[in-house]
């Protein structure tokens, strides 16, 4: 009991100040005297403190720490070998034909193999149609049809829920749970209190115990709905606990089938670690094909998946040329995971028109990784100060004052950020470069305290660590320029509702920093990086074990995810939902990489599987 009190107390105080920050945007410094230093003067200076377990490099006589990272897993030959036949006119024409057929089905809502839709099933049928096209990854074609279907369902929504149809005599768990989830995700004002109607007189969720397929699907949709919880919704927490236990028990009884595969997938990835394109691939494989309409849905999903696969090849080739042009293959001390980052971008931005978003996201994410390896591991303090000053100067002429290994990195950042600012200007109708430069200045400044912690062996408090990590983690860099290219104009005042220091951005940064630390802290410590949320939390709570610290941090993450759900879906936001969803999905995809272990230090089985199933391998037609 004493241990529990020690664990919970700092969480309360932490929540009061979690979203405050000591950082303010500063004007860009035009006078950086450090940049006139001669490279020769740096050679004899000490590097960052070296852990006894860290690998050491002696290039140019400078003692350096290096990470134990493997080289690029995906060579150029593999990328060049990706099939491109799905761009043939016949596939594009077939996709257009299927889209029109499915629109007709949406709009008619009447005929299915000669039978008119019954008023006893029309609500569930509409929800099922919307849910199907979304999970199959083809919903972008049917936005008007989706709205009409959901408007219809919402017009019959009641405090006690809905039945399968508008004339159903009783409410139905499956229809109500699916309705709650789908309507909430589309901004309709539906309360989770509707689930109270499916409890017994003891206040517990109940089931028949027979576990028919219909009942199992109802509980599966209850589980899916429970993950879209807002802060303080106790009934959603209860629904998640009940449905998780029920589904795990059901898996032990039912035969291996499409239903069991779907349950296993959703229990594993849930919602917050479930990349949309990966779910689409899974759903194509388990989707029923008993009717002509169902067959057309699956065929369209597969054709679209493979057409996009052809586009991915061209974009990956472009990214690889960029990666080689700036000399990144020669930086042996850093992680070569540009292909993984492109995969992440293409898992969350699946519209072919969003090429700028995908490539910008991949490049910005890769910059964050390279700079993390430089500032946390490879660079000396004096080199880091020079690079920080160079970013603030924002002038390619300063590259001559940088160490050789930093020159290509600096020019890559300079050129790419400027290039993406021009892309954003096409959408925004204004120059956003100065705003982005300020974001970079703040980000690069936040690395210096962490470098000094490593150099001196200082271990900050938990709050001190989090305040700095909100910026140094780089979330803002990976989100800001990509969303500016999405096609939605974002005036300055609206952009500030989603960009740092807005709560939306803070939540994503803290969630990923905390989750990442629970997977990386041991490897980081071995490289001499003592500061992590785990070690800082243990410092603030003397006597607590690593296991208990991780448990408390995971509880924090679960609570923060509910707050992030609210920030995504709250009705009074002025930020377009497409931009909020893109930022939210960036959190989901990075969270996916941290689900079981550090997916970024070395490509894990899970990350390799993601690359193969969403980029490298087309779907069999």
UniProtKB/Swiss-Prot annotation:
Key words of the record: Chloroplast, Lyase, Magnesium, Metal-binding, Plastid, Transit peptide
A single BP term in Gene Ontology: terpenoid biosynthetic process
Catalytic activity annotation: (2E)-geranyl diphosphate = (-)-beta-phellandrene + diphosphate
Binding site for Mg(2+) 1: 372, 376
Chain residues that bind Mg(2+) 3: 524
Coiled coil stretches, renumbered: none
Motif interval(s): DDXXD motif: 372-376
Subcellular location as annotated: Plastid, Chloroplast
Parts of the chain that traverse the membrane: none
Pathway(s) served: Terpene metabolism; oleoresin biosynthesis; Secondary metabolite biosynthesis; terpenoid biosynthesis
Gene3D superfamilies per UniProt: Farnesyl Diphosphate Synthase (1.10.600.10), Terpene synthase, N-terminal domain (1.50.10.130)
CC per GO annotation: chloroplast
Cofactor: binding details: Binds 3 Mg(2+) or Mn(2+) ions per subunit.
EC number: 4.2.3.52
Major localization class: plastid
Family classification: Belongs to the terpene synthase family. Tpsd subfamily.
Domain remark in the UniProt entry: The Asp-Asp-Xaa-Xaa-Asp/Glu (DDXXD/E) motif is important for the catalytic activity, presumably through binding to Mg(2+).
Protein's job: Monoterpene synthase (TPS) involved in the biosynthesis of monoterpene natural products included in conifer oleoresin secretions and volatile emissions; these compounds contribute to biotic and abiotic stress defense against herbivores and pathogens. Catalyzes the conversion of (2E)-geranyl diphosphate (GPP) to (-)-beta-phellandrene.
Protein name in UniProt: (-)-beta-phellandrene synthase 1, chloroplastic
Species this protein is from: Pinus banksiana
